[in-house]
């Protein structure tokens, strides 16, 4: 379980997050949404252990987070892949740094690439891949270390609408198969409503938790309902419009 208690953080000398309290249970998919500048990415970087926080506590499985760790896998919008390495070696790179022997890490890479739909692409280079394929490699790399918690920072923001829909459904299937805790940062309201088991709305900066909304659309999808059917459901449309109105309220307040 991820537990965040009374978290305060600065960014560039200015308050970024104020009194954040969140809990992410095992097997849940938490989505954080808010206007630009609300501290979404700062929150993810704090959980990942990339930057220090001023006050409060972040704990995963009862252990305080004070730096990066293999129990947390991170996927970024820009992927951060190594262009001089092929797909297989990109996925296995972290395992190599961890001292895992070659045959084992290549087998792990093969298995996670199969999970993300890239079986057979092991020897291709990053420049030979589409944007969606590169994000699949980024997700596979994060999964290779078998983390407890998967953190994703707007991973589909630069993709076209069709590819973004494919990646959303892939992530939901991986979430169902692995049972991992997932925290997704996004600025896309429809994506947030579709994918979250709990949606957290942040205020304009400094970010505070405005509202926490339990949702069931992701569970409906993994139970077999199509994304098209879900997104055309009046309940989904009403929730999307409600969330949109809350985000607009914050944008107007900030401006």
UniProtKB/Swiss-Prot annotation:
Key words of the record: ATP-binding, Cell inner membrane, Cell membrane, Membrane, Nucleotide-binding, Translocase, Transport
Topology of this chain in the membrane: Peripheral membrane protein
InterPro entries tied to this protein: AAA+_ATPase, ABC_transporter-like_ATP-bd, ABC_transporter-like_CS, ABC_transporter_ATP-bind, P-loop_NTPase
Highest taxon above the source species: Bacteria
Binding site for ATP: 34-41
PROSITE patterns associated with the record: ABC_TRANSPORTER_1, ABC_TRANSPORTER_2, TAUB
A GO term, aspect molecular function: ATP hydrolysis activity
Pfam family, one: ABC_tran
Occurrences of domain ABC transporter (ranges): 2-229
The enzyme's E.C. designation: 7.6.2.7
Cellular compartments annotated: Cell inner membrane
Family under the similarity heading: Belongs to the ABC transporter superfamily. Taurine importer (TC 3.A.1.17.1) family.
The protein's role, per its UniProt record: Part of the ABC transporter complex TauABC involved in taurine import. Responsible for energy coupling to the transport system.
Subunit comment: The complex is composed of two ATP-binding proteins (TauB), two transmembrane proteins (TauC) and a solute-binding protein (TauA).
Entry protein name: Taurine import ATP-binding protein TauB
